[in-house]
């Protein structure tokens, strides 16, 4: 269980061995809730050790029991957590920001399911699958065209587009410059992009301006610009940039 308001962190892990008639507190700490620590970990937060406060219980949470070994549990919040003692203790194999680590799963897990002995995890980064109980997690989304742009801009003169694929970075298409058409210009929670109306070599995303090189062997340089007043970050609201034809 967790708190969907206030701290939005882990409240407790409970176990039932009589089909839900009674429940026993398993984790974490000596009692439900309380401040996070090494002995009272918060699995809804961002920290691999579970010592940070808060989290996203209102947004991402998943839980599954291994069909071969009922003592082994998989829990998803921001990170993927594993227990081998029916929920008494937990470890995070790889933090959301450690894509090179064994067992890595993208941040913000929404569902965890077993199909036979295959473990499947759905998250903001797509779908991950394991056929060894979760030790190794592989991205399993080849052929799925599921990139979701929250916002993007395009040049009226050329085939240049820049858009934010929320939680999957900011993506750029610069004519036919890049292999497979698109390149990621930045990670994180990109939600928009703009291409200068009068000069398609200049673009803007959530973090900075971009000077497009037009050559995949050359870097895309960035520059700072005044982002205040800010474009809205709230779902359902719209923000845009307008160009002064006298100076664009």
What residue spans do the PLM features occupy?
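Beta-propeller blade termini and top-face loops
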Residues: 1-248
């Amino acid at each position: 269980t967790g708190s969907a308001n206030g701290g939005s962190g882990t409240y407790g892990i409970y176990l039932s061995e009589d089909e839900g008639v009674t429940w026993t507190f398993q984790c974490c700490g000596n009692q439900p809730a309380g401040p996070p620590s090494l002995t009272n970990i918060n699995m809804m937060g961002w920290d691999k050790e579970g010592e940070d406060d808060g989290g996203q219980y209102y947004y991402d949470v998943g839980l599954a029991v291994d069909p071969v070994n009922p003592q082994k549990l998989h829990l998803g919040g921001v990170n993927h957590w594993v227990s081998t003692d029916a929920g008494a203790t937990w470890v995070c194999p790889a933090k959301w920001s450690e894509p090179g680590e064994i067992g890595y799963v993208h941040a913000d897990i929404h569902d965890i399911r077993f199909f036979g002995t295959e473990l499947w995890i759905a998250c903001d980064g797509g779908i991950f699958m394991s056929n060894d109980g979760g030790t190794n997690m592989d991205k399993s989304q080849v052929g799925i065209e599921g990139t979701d742009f929250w916002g993007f801009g395009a040049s009226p003169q050329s085939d240049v587009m820049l858009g934010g694929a929320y939680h999957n970075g900011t993506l750029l298409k610069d004519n036919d410059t890049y292999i497979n058409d698109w390149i990621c210009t930045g990670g994180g929670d990109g939600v928009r992009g703009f291409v200068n109306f009068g000069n398609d070599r200049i673009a803007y995303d959530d973090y900075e301006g971009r000077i497009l090189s037009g050559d995949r062997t050359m870097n895309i340089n960035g520059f700072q610009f005044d982002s205040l007043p800010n474009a809205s970050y709230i779902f359902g609201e719209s923000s845009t940039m307008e160009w002064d034809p006298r100076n664009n």
